[in-house]
Regions:
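Metal-dependent polysaccharide deacetylase catalytic core of the NodB/CE4 family, i.e.
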Residues: 48-129, 141, 146-153, 171-173, ...
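C-terminal domain-boundary segment and adjacent tail
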Residues: 47-48, 199-290
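Active-site beta->alpha N-cap acidic-glycine motif
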Residues: 1-74
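Alpha-helix N-cap and loop-to-helix initiation/capping positions
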Residues: 25-33, 91-98, 196-200, 240-248
């Protein structure tokens, strides 16, 4: 097993938040599905002796407080995914600060400590949202893991550094831990989780992580609870959307077990705490003061 530590993370939310589906609001069915998904995730992590970062959506934490307390008590890091799962691109600085602050308060009330980390919904911290860093720093956050350094259609920054970056703002400093990508024939390929993990063979994930490790970088992975659900998920958005949300989910648990046997995974905050000297970028006030 490589001595380099890698980042394990789960974006903790109900599945319709992730895939933007219209779904029937049967609260009992949702609770049963969430319990089923989290029990499976917990079993995999316990089996491997791995602890990870759960980026908890604020309203999800409100809905399932027992799970937040349980995961925290078992040694997992509870970070924030914002409160309402709104893209930063749809928020102004005032609304963004309110969303982040509300999520921090919800989690702090449940675990007795304020989260250290933040992940933007839909990885929506893009080139036009650099002002968000000053707000995150001002709220006391130590790191963000929000940037996908590839030119995606709806998110991503194609020329963003692929290694951790220290971001200095007038309100404080924090670290950006970008999601993992690899260069393939001159183009960046997102390999951190989601569709790539569901659609590709586990060997492809291993090769990507090994390549990143050889470059001296930690592999930053992410998954969602619904990707561990053995039961089919259905929305009102038609056949194509249902096909997408169910694609490859049956293989995710085995792929994660496979990766845990070959790489050392820890919470994101543990990797951040061990960073030495890394590049720094100053973000001047660009409208982030509220």
């Amino acid at each position: 097993m490589n001595a380099l530590k890698h980042c394990a993370s789960i974006d903790l939310e109900d599945w319709y938040n992730d895939v933007e589906c219209v779904v029937p609001r049967d609260s009992r069915a949702f609770s049963q599905a969430f319990d089923r998904q989290l029990n499976r995730i917990q079993s995999i992590f316990d089996e491997a002796g791995v602890r990870c970062t759960f980026f908890a959506l604020g309203r999800t934490a409100e809905r399932y407080p027992a799970w937040i307390k349980r995961l925290h008590a078992e040694g997992h890091e509870i970070a924030t995914h914002g409160y309402g799962h709104a893209r930063i691109t749809t928020l102004d600085p005032v609304s963004f600060r309110a969303d982040v602050r509300r999520s921090l308060e919800v989690v702090a009330d449940l675990i007795g400590a304020r989260p250290q980390g933040y992940r933007a919904p839909y990885f929506s911290l893009g080139r036009g949202e650099m002002w968000a860093y000053e707000i995150l720093a001002g709220e006391g956050l130590r790191y963000s893991s929000s940037v996908f350094p590839f030119p995606g259609r709806n998110y991503g920054i194609g020329d963003h550094p692929t290694s951790p970056l220290r971001v200095a703002t007038p309100s404080g400093t924090l670290v950006e831990m970008p999601l993992s990508v690899v260069d393939l024939a001159g183009r960046r390929l997102p390999v951190a989780g989601g569709g790539f993990w569901r659609a590709t063979h586990r060997l492809a994930i291993r090769l990507a992580a090994s390549r990143i490790a050889r470059e001296g970088r930690s592999f930053v992975m992410y998954l969602h609870p619904h990707e561990f659900d053995p039961e089919p998920l259905h929305s009102h958005n038609g056949f194509a959307r249902n096909l997408y949300v169910n694609l490859g989910r049956v293989s995710i648990a085995d792929k994660l077990r496979y990766m845990f046997k070959r790489f050392a995974f820890v919470p994101v905050s543990s990797v951040v705490a061990g960073l030495g000297s890394i590049p720094e970028r100053f973000i001047a006030n660009s409208g982030g003061h509220v």
